[in-house]
A protein has these predicted regions:
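Extracytoplasmic substrate-binding proteins
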Residues: 15, 106-181, 275-298
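Proline-aspartate-enriched helix->loop->beta-strand connector
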Residues: 86-89, 93-99, 116, 226, ...
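A short, structured surface patch at a secondary-structure boundary
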Residues: 33-88
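Extracytoplasmic ligand-binding site segments that recognize negatively charged/polar headgroups
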Residues: 50-59, 104-106, 121-134, 170-196, ...
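Structured C-terminal subdomain patch of bacterial secreted/periplasmic proteins
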Residues: 137, 229-298
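Short helix-initiation/N-cap motifs at beta->coil->alpha
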Residues: 13, 77-86, 212-222
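Short, low-complexity disordered leader/linker segments with a strong preference
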Residues: 1-18, 298
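Basic- and aromatic-lined ligand-binding clefts that recognize polyanionic substrates
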Residues: 24, 32-36, 146-208
């Protein structure tokens, strides 16, 4: 940690003060790993994809993470009730810990005893732009933060120009969990996941926005409620199943998006790229669904 300046970051756990410029940063969550890489800052330790990633626990767009960055025990993201690797994090002697993509901050509160810890700002997915702005302040590199955000917006602006017919159309991000027979749908237009679609001219259907059942930016429904997926574009992960399994669900083939070529059945990495977006992951995932974007736009 160098310098004496102090930056205060408001989080769901209260304000976090970071004094000086941190140099040993632990990133818990794919969004923060990606944000650091945008600043050419390597995490000393990280949790990202866990068992859903490659041999280093990384997603396909995270190729620039250095070989000497330590992959931490990912039990907390791989298992319900998995332990946070507190001792492992402490052994790295971090001067800043970044946490995102967690269902509850309670198991992570003890990290603040190790180093200043930046938790999410609210109980929904933070936008990648907000995280870049936060890092810009903490690293005393606000000009770089503005440049990174402009670069990201240039990518989505280009996609919007490629498909002008998307303007005014609707989109939903969802997953069907076969083990529990539950449908999870992003319904809050202010959620970071929904804002990826918003950046290319798409909106969340108003019927979902008005739902009283939104929690953490999402609605969880039974399979009989597939009818809520009225959007022109439906991006869905068959969690624990296949596209063929989805097509067997009553009502799936009758979705408006199905007849219009707007159903994108995607893999885990692609849905994560939307669900907890970063500049890099949003570009990766949007490129994966270009055929559906073209169909919806036409």
């Amino acid at each position: 940690m160098s310098g004496s300046r102090t930056v205060t970051v408001d989080t769901i756990a209260g304000p976090t003060e970071v004094t000086g410029t941190p140099s040993r940063i632990v990133a818990f969550g794919q969004q923060w790993v990606d944000a650091l890489i945008e600043f050419d800052v390597q995490p000393v330790g990280y949790v990202s994809a866990g068992s859903n990633g490659d041999e280093r626990g990384l997603y396909p767009w995270q190729t620039e993470v250095a070989d000497d960055s330590i992959m931490l025990d990912a039990s907390a993201v791989d298992q319900v009730g998995g332990a946070v690797p507190t001792e492992q994090i402490a052994s790295l002697q971090p001067d800043l810990i970044l946490v995102s993509g967690i269902p509850s901050i309670d198991p992570y509160r003890g990290l603040s005893d190790i180093a200043p810890t930046i938790f999410p700002k609210a109980e929904k997915v933070e936008t990648w732009e907000s995280q870049i702005e936060t890092l810009g302040r903490v690293l005393d590199r606000e000009d770089d933060a503005s440049r990174i955000i402009e670069e990201g917006h240039a990518v989505t602006d280009d996609i919007e120009q490629d498909y002008p017919g998307l303007d005014g159309k609707t989109a939903v991000l969802s997953q069907f969990v076969f083990d529990t027979q539950q449908l999870a749908v992003v319904a809050d237009p202010e959620d970071g996941a929904a804002q990826v679609f918003g950046s290319i001219g798409l909106t969340v259907p108003q019927s979902l926005v008005d739902s009283p059942d939104i929690s953490h930016g999402r609605i969880v429904l039974s399979p009989e409620r597939l009818d809520v997926l009225t959007a022109d574009l439906v991006v869905m992960l068959p969690n624990g199943g296949t596209r063929e399994d989805l097509e067997k669900l009553p009502g799936f083939s009758g979705l408006p998006a199905a007849s219009g070529g707007g159903v994108a059945v995607v893999d885990f990495a692609t849905v994560v790229g939307f669900n907890t977006p970063s500049k890099a992951s949003a570009e990766y995932s949007l490129n994966k669904i270009r055929p559906q974007l073209e169909a919806v736009a036409s």
